Design a protein with these regions (language model features):
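N-terminal secretory signal peptides that target proteins for export/translocation
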Residues: 1-11
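Bacterial N-terminal signal peptides
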Residues: 14-27
């Protein structure tokens, strides 16, 4: 009887192993269904607008993940290798991409930072810090690892070029759907022009209200809409800063008469509250990656409008 039970247990374990393997394989296959894969959400929003009704799109990084520190999973590799088109920013933004993309034909990917029309619109690190009014060396930091600010999706002008590049590649991949691709691009450009005008009207009332950020990511958006970023601070988002650091930041906030300081979702509220304690500075949240926004044809517009509202929620309080 014991031998019989033991034999059946072994068979059950073997069966469960096979079942788990099949589920894992199927899950990877499901991940690999999308034909167009974008590295980060805002780029994926643009891709979805142009590819809507043409083919499926997906986004590599999950909500809350940073493109600077992300580690690829097996399902990510399957997704990238099976995609007909991979869209990414550049190696200084997604350091994890170049190695895996060596196995993908150049015709199957768009590295946005290499597009000539985008290159001429790039902001350098020098541009970013000229925009700031203070030069506190031990508290100002570049988020960018390279010479240029690679948060290019925050520029409406560059977004139009990204959309055009995706359009051109889709025409090649799906010539039988060229009419729909053309119409999607036209709709995207019309909608974006309307959104730009809307945002400009909303933000004109807060253009002279200075603020600090904890992520040097918003230069393109700030330049387009004339916003007054005073500078940026660098702290560990999960660790309480020391007394000297807190005092130095508070002095900066007071000296420059900052209205707000903006953090991102990964920052502990307790850390930010400690930094503004004893000042009149308000706390706001900004998100440059579109966290919480679902992938849809209008997602890029929703992304820009949400960012605008986040700015207004803090800067426009009386």
């Amino acid at each position: 009887v014991k031998k019989y039970i033991l034999l059946n247990c072994k068979r059950l374990v073997s069966f469960l192993k096979i079942l788990v393997s099949l589920v894992f394989i199927q899950s990877i296959a499901n991940y690999a269904n999308a034909k167009i894969v974008s590295s980060v959400k805002p780029i994926g929003f643009i891709a979805e607008a142009i590819a809507s009704g043409v083919t499926d799109t997906d986004i590599l990084l999950p909500d809350g993940a940073s493109p600077h520190t992300y580690n690829l999973k097996p399902s990510d590799l399957a997704k990238l290798k099976s995609a007909e088109l991979v869209i990414w920013v550049g190696e200084d933004m997604e350091a994890f991409m170049p190695t895996i993309l060596k196995s993908i034909d150049n015709q199957n990917q768009i590295e946005l930072m290499t597009i000539p029309e985008i290159k001429v619109l790039l902001r350098t690190s020098h541009d970013v810090h000229e925009h700031e009014e203070h030069h506190s060396a031990d508290m100002t930091a570049q988020d960018h690892h390279g010479e240029y600010d690679e948060h290019i999706w925050l520029s409406p002008n560059i977004a139009k070029i990204i959309a055009q590049s995706i359009h051109d590649r889709l025409i090649t991949l799906y010539p039988d759907k060229s009419v729909l691709v053309d119409e999607n691009l036209r709709e995207f450009n019309v909608k974006l022009a309307e959104i730009e005008q809307n945002i400009a009207k909303k933000l004109i009332t807060v253009q002279n209200r200075g603020y600090f950020v904890f992520h040097d990511a918003y230069g393109y958006f700030e330049a387009r809409f004339g916003l007054k970023r005073l500078g940026s601070f660098t702290i560990n988002p999960a660790v309480q800063p020391g007394v000297q650091k807190v005092y130095a930041i508070q002095q900066e906030l007071k000296e420059h008469k900052a209205v707000c300081v903006f953090h991102e979702p990964q920052f502990s509220p307790a850390v930010i509250e400690k930094l503004v304690d004893g000042t009149d500075v308000r706390i706001g949240e900004l998100n440059p990656l579109g966290t919480g926004i679902a992938l849809s044809k209008d997602a890029y517009s929703q992304f820009l409008l949400k960012l605008t509202q986040q700015l207004l929620d803090c800067l426009d309080r009386n």
